[in-house]
């Protein structure tokens, strides 16, 4: 049962069914989601995985892999696992988790694994732009999540987006990819 974390009602879970365990976390398409819609476990899992892969990069560097190839391997085995489904969970990142991921990037940069220093916000912007570029296509599987298009009203002000901005009551919806990106994009234009 997934629920809003700030809900004031106490929800009693149903009695466990025969041979079915009740879990506080679930792994859906490779992303660990808690029952309070928290991604801390997922980020901690990714950081553990990245630490193991940093050791592999260290061994490759000691065996004489040139910096350019080391950079390619770093992109493939560390940056890409952090980018996987990042738009879905990036809005729920807390400051301490963001700082921890940025510390990993700084460590990898200082060890010479990566030539350019990354930040979490750069990765989030890259993945958001890539996804939002493909969402307006009707063939995209998440196209139905977009808000309805704006009606054709004449205005002297040029707008970047032709979508109506959604209203939200709950923080969970506000942190979702589409709502977060639409508001950020409109406020910056």
Regions inferred by a protein language model and the residue ranges of each:
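Short, conserved micro-motifs composed of acidic
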Residues: 1-24
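Structured loops at beta-to-helix junctions and adjacent beta-edge loops in soluble globular domains
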Residues: 2-5, 31-36, 168, 180-182
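Short conserved micro-motifs at the rims of enzyme active sites and ligand-binding pockets
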Residues: 11-13, 40-43, 188-189
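Basic, alpha-helical interaction scaffolds
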Residues: 19-87
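Generic recognition of well-structured, leucine-rich alpha-helical segments
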Residues: 35, 53-63, 80, 85, ...
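Residue-level recognition of alpha-helical structural elements
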Residues: 39, 65-71, 90-97, 116, ...
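Short linear motifs embedded in intrinsically disordered, charge-biased segments
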Residues: 94-189
């Amino acid at each position: 049962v997934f629920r809003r974390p700030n809900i004031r009602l106490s929800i009693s879970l149903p009695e466990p069914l025969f041979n079915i365990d009740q879990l506080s976390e679930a792994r859906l398409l490779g992303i660990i989601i808690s029952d309070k819609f928290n991604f801390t476990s997922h980020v901690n899992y990714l950081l553990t995985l990245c630490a193991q892969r940093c050791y592999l990069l260290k061994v490759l560097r000691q065996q004489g892999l040139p910096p350019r190839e080391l950079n390619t391997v770093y992109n493939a085995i560390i940056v890409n696992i952090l980018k996987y489904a990042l738009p879905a969970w990036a809005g729920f990142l807390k400051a301490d988790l963001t700082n921890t991921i940025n510390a990993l990037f700084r460590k990898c940069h200082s060890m010479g694994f990566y030539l350019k220093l990354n930040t979490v916000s750069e990765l989030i912007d890259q993945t958001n732009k890539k996804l939002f570029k493909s969402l307006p296509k009707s063939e995209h599987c998440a196209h139905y999540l977009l808000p309805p298009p704006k009606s054709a009203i004449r205005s002297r002000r040029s707008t970047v987006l032709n979508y109506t901005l959604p209203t939200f009551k709950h923080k969970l919806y506000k942190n979702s990819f589409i709502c977060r990106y639409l508001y950020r994009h409109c406020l910056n234009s």
